[in-house]
Amino acid sequence: AKNGDNIVASAHLYGGTYNQFKNVFSDMGIEVRFVDPADPQNFANATDDKTRAYYGEVLPNPSFEVFPISEVAEIGRPLGIPLIVDNTAAPVICKPFDHGAAVIIHSTTKFIGGHGTSIGGIIVDSGNFDWEAFPERQPALNTPDPSYGGAIWTEAVKPLGPIAYILKARTTILRDMGAAMSPFNAFMFIQGLETLALRMREHSSNAEKVAKYLSSHDSVERVSYPSHMDGYAKERADKYLTKGNGGLMGFEVKGGIEAGKKFINALEMVYHVANIGDSRSLAIHPGSTTHSQL
């Protein structure tokens, strides 16, 4: 996307992502239209000829209502609009490519790294999206790129398959924006991948037990965990989360925001820090930290 374009995104996002979309992208002239993913048709309703992508988080923090991946992907593909999903919170337990997502992103700092030791992120192109089919929808990939000798990315990669997006991201965007991972961080993430499946299994098992306990606690107003939801939220969790429900949950204690702060400050065994997917048990109060600016 560039100045004058727009992205339609789920309104259920991590606070840092929402802030970037709402403010940083706005300063760049890119409009992000936030919609309620409860009804996938909201994505279609917010789309126009300048829409370049749909975006959502598989397990958004802190609502943890699973994103309707296939429903939104099916709206976008006939229009030439790729679905980009953040699967940071659900590696292994959800496979968005199986449900039509075109691109997956991860903050590798979280579950992939697994120990809170390194900062990084990855973009994964499915190779199943036809970036050439709607050239007017993806002009950056279908017109000469002056920053790379006039290359037309969809033409340049034809012998390799439909990888125009990821090749441009790797060749020019990474070059120009500078988000280069250090070799040592990459090594740490590769190590983390070796035990990722095992850790996600245990994260899910432990979280399920905690959610069950909290659901019956007198001081808890509500628990947000995929297996403990009702209606469409539970249906989507059952559809998309095939190997556990993840290691994250949200819950509300009775007494409002001040009671939440008091609870967090009283924790002794559980760490009060923001990083998820760590080797430690963590808790945070979103209203006064990660989502305080929303």
Name each model-derived stretch:
Residues 200, 215, 219-294:
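Conserved C-terminal alpha-helix-loop-beta "cap" of PLP-dependent enzymes
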